[in-house]
Amino acid sequence: MGILPLIWLLGGPWRDHGTDSLAVLKAARRAQQAFEATRRANLPELPGSATGMCDERIGRLCYWYEGGLDTTPEEPPRIRDARVKLLATLASAAEALPGDEWIVGQRIRYLVEHQAYDAALHVMASCRATLWWCEALGGLARHAAGDFAGADSTFAAALRDMPEDERCRWTDISLLLEGALAKRYKRLDCAGRETFAARWWWLTRPLYSLGGNDRRTEHYARRTFARIEEDTRTTFGLYWADDLRDLVVRYGWATYWTREPPTSDLVRSEPRISGHEPSPSFRFAPSEGAFDNPGGAKPDDWALDSRHARDRYAPEYARAFVPLDHQAAVFRRDDSCVVVAAYDLSHDTLFTDDSVAGALALAADEQTVAIARDSGLIYGTRALTVTAPCQPFVLSLEARAPREHHVARARYGVATAAASPEQVEISDLLLFDPPDSVRDDLSAVIPRAYGTTRLATPRRLGVFWELYGARQGSDSTPATMALTVTREGGGGWLRRAAQSLGLVGPHRNVRLEWQELPPPGPIAPRSLVVDLSDLAPGRYLIEVGVAPAVGDRVTARREITITR
């Protein structure tokens, strides 16, 4: 952007303090309508952009999602030049009517569209409209610029300062809910809905490792954008109505538009215009089960790639958002839990850049998040540990390639509880690449932990676990321990037929059993190296069972897949 256009964006080319307010506002509205007419007349043509295949019909509108990486066409110079002139007109109108909400809203909307974020923030610094509206516009500008933490704080201030009935409308998430959650939400009063929404936003947050909840700031940015567009002529050529508002709140606003080529040179008609939201986009909302019991949530309680999603969001930092293969285990320390998580992106074709930023977050609620961060080269396994109180929490392991804009995430619940001093307990199993000499110590095992449970025919597999309360007082009776590796499933019909004919042997399993006297003390670390070289590729269950002299038998399990 040149210097002259920037001056136009901020200050305008002319000032007329003698113009009456109504005339100024009418002129500004005519300028906005004229710009949208110019935009419609100069949109790039895209055959087949209006397919008629709708995922959702919302009033007058047809919405569909094609997926894939978006390729935004270059904006025609005529549209860009016309926007600069509109912004100059709006800047002049703002000089005459500095407190007008419609004018300042249009300035922010078109500055954000122009990607002039610094100019938008400059405008907000001198905003003289209603306080909460200025704050909401500032939240929109900060969110669009990628300052999610700043946007979160600014929107929080706007919600605090707006009238109660307005706040109830802005915090309403009914358009984003479906099924049983939608029915439950509908029965709540405003205060109950705010409590419900706080929990929902916590579980909907895409990455706990980023400052601010960008899915929530996206929602309030959409609410702000929808209010800006009220009583305006839109790019579609339609006047604003509830269907356009619902579309924006659920799927966001279009970042570019295209039109269908004319069907005939003889008949002139209004062009068929398609708005294009950013892609790929995802649904980050939790299932009802995860909402009610976060500590028991499963990975598939977040269906990011749902084809017919109730809502969508395309984070600017994620051209891809994929599951993260990993291994995680929980170990006790008094009333705290140590969570170890390891991942390995060496063979992930999405992560071709050398560097990755990783994080392990344990979220008991929105305000209680323990997090460890890590960054470095993608080659080899990276392990992170977090210590937090033993309680149910959501585990979120996150890896991000900032330059490639790729994200991988593993998220699910972990239902830990305080240890019982009178009961023998066992930790999770942690698989590792064993050295020649194995030391029974968690800190020694973590650097060698596998970043996956898919193992390429390992000859030797290290298995680490801890026992708690296994030897109480002066008890000197040994405990019986066993480790088994068992093939899951019986194989396909072809293998069963070959086995019945004696062409192949039965699946091999591994079983080790021994007795030992646990050492005194609250924690008894143990590790064992198992030879798996005779096992065929497939899915297996590793189980460690301990039968103490007093008390019930305890077990820990880990599923693995052996590949060639």
Where are these regions (language model features)?
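Intrinsically disordered, low-complexity terminal regions enriched in Ser/Thr/Pro/Gly
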Residues: W14-I79, F284-R564
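Generic helix N-cap/helix-start motif at coil->alpha-helix transitions
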Residues: Y63-G68, L86, A96-V104, A129-A136, ...
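A cross-family detector of function-defining hotspots
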Residues: R187-Y317
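TPR-repeat structural position
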Residues: R83, A116-D118, F148
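TPR/TPR-like (Sel1-like) alpha-helical repeat modules
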Residues: R128-T130, H143-D165
